A protein has these predicted regions:
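Domain-level representation of secreted and single-pass membrane ectodomains enriched
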Residues: 3-6, 25, 231, 240-476
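Alpha-helical interaction elements in eukaryotic regulators
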Residues: 6, 76-83, 135-139, 230-233, ...
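Metzincin-family zinc-dependent endopeptidase catalytic domain
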Residues: 42-48, 52, 56-60, 67-202
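Surface-exposed beta-strand-to-loop junctions
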Residues: 57-65, 120-121, 212-220, 282-284, ...
């Protein structure tokens, strides 16, 4: 079934279904619970004579104008903007502040979390009740309804993947679980238990602990997350609106980026992007290679501290740099943009880091975790110190007292730069000593601190268990 037929299906839904409303999220947004309401009066306001998809410009951009109620706090607004930013970064959808457009959405705190399906013509309300609905995944759920998407658990092949416990669903809410008619066009994509459009296991249950939706064949599969759009959610948006983009969402706690893979799947792409969105803590990104194409003049890798290009820039690396500095985000989001006019490639890996950070100032201080108190066992911290291009980093230690062991196999501080891998014994330091000044060969230094699970050094040492260093930068 082609996209045109899918438009007819969605428009049919607009004429026959009540507005869908997302339930609130609990348990750290892992499950969606029952707070939706059916608002039958809204269906009478639908303009049935208009197409329900938002139009696409000749440049390939789909614009959805919106207004945002002044009733939201600055914190609420920041959450909504962050949710919107992911569409901008990874699709051809652009939610933009309304100027004089006739068709637009009004984001307001009305009476729950709900939205019309698709574009209905004129102004249309998207309700995000505050408090309760202003969470990133809930905002994106409702924005997906605006784009024309129904709930994942109502798609026409759902009986293969989930079982509805009808006895646990009150009659007034059973319409929210009925399979979509006519049959949905799933665009050749698999059923998505992790979709932001999927209800939670206990949504609308008539009794605590009684499930209304059970995955099969494995009933333990998580459903109903409200962290944000899934990778398949984004694929559906890009296929439905025929977005000509090269983008990927990475959401595992660790993983890899490979521009060669992206380019092989998207020939002749001049731009590919990755959004790394880990569940918690910070993203640490380390490049294994950067191979500019012969004669390149503008190929680059840009890394942003957030969900897109409106976020602070962490690095902007072009052809002339062979060794890219390791970078760390301030939160759980990092955006990577690769621009190439030829055959340039890069490979990188990322991981979740709970302790550490990135320093880009001309000077500063780095200390052991918990300083001036003793650091805890089973602790890992990473610090990336990056100086401006053409500069180098000097480390001057004020104090250094870690557990001593042969080859520093217990507690240690490893120090590496662009000339060293950071894995050899000579890069690890431990014990109590006067550390000499260390100078990098390039413009960055990577510090990795590790303490093992045993507290033997901390219990017997009278010298203290910490390190403190002052770093400066200077022209090479």
């Amino acid at each position: 079934m082609d996209a045109a037929k899918y438009i007819l299906i969605i428009c049919y839904l607009l004429q026959t279904l009540l507005p869908l409303q997302i339930s609130l999220a609990t348990d750290s947004q892992n499950e969606a619970e029952d707070s939706e309401e059916d608002v039958s009066s809204i269906i009478a306001k639908l303009n049935k004579g208009q197409t329900c998809f938002w139009p696409k410009s000749s440049s390939g951009i789909v614009t959805v104008p919106y207004t945002l109620s002044v009733d939201y706090t600055s914190t609420d607004s920041a959450i909504i903007y962050s949710a919107i930013q992911e569409y901008t970064s990874l699709t051809c959808i652009r939610f933009v502040e309304r100027k004089t457009e006739t068709d637009y959405i009004q984001i307001q705190s009305v009476d729950g979390c709900w939205s019309y399906l698709g574009r209905i013509g004129g102004s249309q309300v998207l309700s995000l009740l505050n408090p309760g609905c202003v969470l990133k995944g809930i905002v994106q759920h409702e924005l997906n309804h605006v784009l024309g998407f129904v709930h994942e658990h109502t798609r026409s092949d759902r009986d293969t993947y989930v079982y509805m416990e009808w006895a646990n669903i009150p009659d007034v809410y059973k319409s929210n679980f009925e399979m979509t008619q006519p049959a949905t066009n799933n665009m050749g994509l698999p059923y998505d238990y992790s979709s932001v459009m999927h209800y939670g296991r206990y949504a609308f249950s008539n009794a605590p602990g009684k499930a209304t939706i059970v995955p099969k064949p494995d009933p333990s599969v998580p459903i109903g997350q409200r962290y944000g759009l899934s990778a398949l959610d984004l694929q559906k948006i890009n296929r439905l609106y025929q977005c000509d983009v090269c983008s990927s969402l990475l959401f595992d706690p660790s993983g890899y980026l490979n521009s060669g893979y992206a380019q092989s799947a998207n020939q002749n792409r001049s731009q590919c992007v990755w959004l790394i969105r880990i569940p918690t803590n910070k993203v640490f990104l380390q490049f294994q290679s950067f191979d500019p194409s012969p004669g390149c003049i503008s190929d680059s890798v840009k890394v942003y501290d957030g969900a897109g290009k409106m976020s602070p820039l962490l690095i902007n690396t072009t052809c002339g740099m062979k060794k890219l500095p390791p970078v760390m985000s301030s939160g759980n989001l990092m955006f990577v943009e690769f621009l190439s006019g030829g055959a340039s490639t890069f490979t990188a890996s990322y991981q979740t880091v709970a302790c550490g950070g990135m320093q880009t100032k001309l000077n500063g201080t780095v200390t052991s975790p918990g300083y001036p108190t003793k650091y805890l066992p089973s602790t890992d911290c990473i610090w990336s110190i990056v100086a401006p291009s053409g500069n180098r980093v000097q480390l001057n230690f004020i104090s250094f007292a870690l557990e001593s062991s042969r080859n520093c196999v217990y507690d240690y501080l490893s120090i590496s730069d662009s000339s060293r891998s950071g894995t050899s014994v000579s890069d690890k330091y431990c014990g109590a000593k006067n550390m000499p000044p260390l100078v990098s060969s390039g413009n960055w230094v990577l510090l990795k601190f590790h303490s093992d699970i045993v507290r033997r050094w901390m219990e017997t040492n009278d010298l203290g268990t910490d390190y403190t260093l002052f770093f400066t930068t200077e022209r090479i």
